[in-house]
Amino acid sequence: MNNFDFHSPASVADATKALGAGDDGCYLAGGQSLLPAMKTGLSMPTDLVGLDKIAQLKGICTSAPGAGRPALHIGAMTTHAAVAANADVIRLIPALARLADGIGDSAVRARGTLGGSLGLNDPAACYPAGVLGLGASITTDRRSIAADDFFKGLYETALEPGELITEVIFPIPEKAAWMKFKQPASRFSMVGVFVSKGPAGVRVAVTGAGHFAFRARALEAALEKQWSPASCDGVAIAPAGLNADIHASAAYRAHLITVLAKRAVAQTV
């Protein structure tokens, strides 16, 4: 691991200032991906800006009455374990609690964060499918970014240099479910599918199958006509452009998308 300067700010303003003052700095959230990358030399930042002491970035709350449509607000530094155990998440979006509870193992869930997962945008991560599948918005220190505009490519997002995720706002769906076919050793998604019906319409978001999370438009169109498991029958997902590796071929992943979407919808009816 290379030498670096460590900063521990207590506010978002101080965090962005510290990062801007460094030559090649990184924000440190839970460290579940960044620290292993630093240990192997894949990432060599000159400065690490720890976010753990910024209270503004932690916590879960609901929109105040009269603030428009009800929504769930989750701070970027909220851990997976906290999301999974939160009473409001379990009551309002139980599928999101289930998603968080299935990430990694207990050690990963105790340290890993919502904002860290989204900022990295690992192609097999769970949260991108949940955020995209619920039509959430990502709030940063500069602006609000719709989920549809956030995920750009392999480990690539709409975030600009130095931009910091502060919270994610989830609209409350009428129905939602999450299904994951996991790689047993890592518990990452070989394919994961999040379905929802609500203020953002019908959405089917997929992770693990492509270079980044995406919406399965053919399945959405079928479910718009009728929200039932049978609507997924006969919807073929093209394997072209999907991931293929030692765990699964592109054709198998394409098949899993439809199978998991059908199972997810079945959970909601």
Predicted regions and their residues:
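C-terminal structural segment of proteins
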Residues: 1-269
